[in-house]
Curated annotation (Swiss-Prot):
Belongs to the purine/pyrimidine phosphoribosyltransferase family. GfcR subfamily. Disulfide bonds: none annotated. This is Transcriptional regulator GfcR. Gene3D superfamilies: 3.40.50.2020. It comes from Methanothrix thermoacetophila (strain DSM 6194 / JCM 14653 / NBRC 101360 / PT) (Methanosaeta thermophila). The gene is gfcR.
Amino acid sequence: MKSIEDLIKKATELKSEGLSEGQISEELNVSRETITWLLTHAERATVPGPKDISVDWSMIGRSAYRLSHIAQALTEMIFDILDEKELDIDIVVGVALSGVPLASMVADHMGVGLAVYMPTKQMASQDVKPHGNLSTNFSDVSGRECVIVDDVITSGRTLEEAVAYLDDRGAKTNVIAVLIDKKGIDSIAGVPVCSLLKVIRVN
């Protein structure tokens, strides 16, 4: 995306295709608050937008070759933390949607199993209150030591949710690994965070 107008247009298109604001925020790598603003206030500019940064990592994501190299670098960083803290890993948990391709390559590099977590923001239900869950098509996390992999930390809520979900199922989260951290944080819910890039606002 090159401008705020591009973001408004893309957010509006995705909304018209039936995506929820949480799903749109995942696609555009901005917070849900920013999506709400883009869809309701941006064109009128009556309310200032939230402070956020749009991240477009599609040049990496559209190439399995590039993504594999990024996953290798992230894997090395994960091993550094695990070694330093004398921790182990059984399962890499990818956060859907955009964290899954990266997580599958990290799991392959590490030689461990793969699980997929669907966060609440990916659920759309009018009948019941949505909540995140693990796909049953992948590894079981019960009693296992895990690393969570996602693409971007925007607010940290999705990863807090994932850690709590895994904890409720008897899993232990030892590391959270992301491509880009827009919060500049060292840990989430007491779990160390490693990122290839930290983006920190200075204003």
